[in-house]
Amino acid sequence: MCLTVLSPSGDSVGHMYLRGFGHGISFGVEPSDGGVLLWVESDADPRTGYGRAIARVPFRDGTVLDSASAGLRHHRPLPGARRMHPTLDLTNRRVLVSHWVGRRHAYAVYRTEDFLAQRYEPLHNIADTALRKGETFQGCALHDEHIYQLTGNPYTDEAGENPPSAGGNTFVSTIDVSSGRTVARRRVTAAPGLRFREPEGIAVRPGSTPELCIALSVKTRDRRKLTVYSCGS
């Protein structure tokens, strides 16, 4: 997994390789006095490529870190769970862990301090009530009382199941973190003319007016590019 740091204008200003950590569907970025700490899935299952644990690692530009490195702590808050992906609510100091148990997708929410101390007593343990049959999970975010969940696929051709003329099947669902109830679901209609247009990543940019940010992947001849759209959360 390669983590790339981008400037607001889209220029690459740093990168780090994480080997054996996982797929990287969602992750957290925690500012610290010494720089930036990354919350990522870790201990990838060799059969699937998805993480079986959560790690918190410092970002070090230009370096390579192995999941099996000595001294790296792998948090395993949910024994038996698979495909674990973390993200952070920096405002309220909470950790959200997306995970699967059997065929069921779920979320667990922890206080950051408790999680780091390996006190894995969740504030909330929530079955995903928003994910519909056949949908592809593409990321999640936690802010205040809501989980924001991104789903969707890249465009197919016009004869396929997700043609550009239909506007794509990208959706954001809002889940109440206390009750687990899905309280809203909206199709993302931004940039319908993008080539490929696969939804890949969602986050909340905190501030006096928080913004919900959604990334759409664009396939070009030599690489993929990313376009990010924001709206009021």
What is the meaning of each model-derived region?
Residues R181-G207:
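Conserved blade-ending motifs and adjacent loop-strand segments that build the rim/top face
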Residues H23-V36, P79-L96, Q138-H143, E200-E211:
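Structural signature of eukaryotic scaffold interfaces centered on beta-propeller domains
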Residues D43-T48, V101-H105, P154-A159, V218-R223:
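Short glycine/acidic-enriched loop and turn motifs that connect beta-strands
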Residues M1-P8, Y50-G62, A106-F115, N162-G180, ...:
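Beta-propeller blade signature
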Residues T4-S42:
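Blade-loop segments of beta-propeller domains
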Residues R132-R181:
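Loop/turn-rich, solvent-exposed surfaces of beta-rich toroidal or solenoidal domains
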Residues G49-L90:
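Asp-box/WD-like beta-propeller blade repeats and closely related beta-sheet repeat scaffolds
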